[in-house]
A protein has these predicted regions:
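His/Asp/Glu-rich metal-coordinating catalytic cores
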Residues: 2-74, 79-220
């Protein structure tokens, strides 16, 4: 029997571009889908093309019109291109915010800068703990990146498992944050992954990136 539920992946920003990360996941029968949002970022304009513009944000009209179907916002890390618009856009979205502790501190400051209450921010422990949000179960997956407590997301529906990596670097010895846990990713792969949404700058280079640990000695 074919399921009447469908999985939706809609990048509102950040796909095929640098910055303005905002990814919408939906699940459910047509017209009655429930949604979660991964990241609410900004991008910075090119000064020669958009003078006088300070920030650029994604167009949220699609999910604004379905705001009562949005069950949660998950922030992967505290860089501006992933969190920078949270204080500006939250009034249009009006959904709980989930993230790790360091990211929550930054999110709280951005909300309060815009006179928004930060009471809806919930700090989550890392995977294998999972948060039930609507029809989704979401786990916070620690990954190495150039900021504390960067994370990917393990997103499960009753029918699929999605890995949304967030920004990551395969660094076994980062200066900041946790090292890349290849066993954790292998275990997830062995459980079965239906969709991998991978976000990594310079991913098409066939040369390994340098560990950030290599920078310590030159600047010490």
């Amino acid at each position: 029997m074919t399921s009447k539920n469908k999985l939706i992946y809609l990048p509102l920003g950040g796909a095929g571009e640098i910055g303005m990360n905002m990814y919408l996941y939906g699940y459910g029968p047509k017209g009655k889908e429930r949604f979660i949002l991964a990241d609410v970022g900004v991008t910075f304009p090119a000064m020669d093309g958009t003078p006088g513009v300070d920030l650029i944000m994604a167009d949220t009209k699609f999910i604004q019109d379905k705001a009562d179907q949005l069950d949660g916002i998950f922030i992967t890390h505290a860089h501006e291109d992933h969190i920078g618009a949270i204080g500006l856009l939250w009034p249009r979205l009006n959904a709980p915010i989930y993230c790790r502790k360091f990211t929550a501190v930054v999110a709280k400051a951005k909300m309060e800068d815009r006179n928004q209450s930060s009471d809806m921010i919930e700090i989550l422990p890392p995977y294998p703990e999972m948060k039930k949000v609507g029809p989704f179960k979401v786990g916070i997956l620690p990954v190495p990146h150039s900021i504390p407590e960067a994370s990917g997301l393990v997103i499960e529906t009753p029918e699929q498992r999605i890995i949304h990596t967030g920004d990551l670097k395969l660094d076994p010895n980062p200066v900041v944050g946790e090292p890349f846990n290849s066993k954790l990713f292998a275990d997830l792969g062995n459980k079965g992954v239906d969709v991998l949404v991978c976000d990594s700058t310079n991913i098409f280079s066939n040369k390994p990136g340098r560990s950030e640990a290599t920078l310590v000695k030159p600047i010490a």
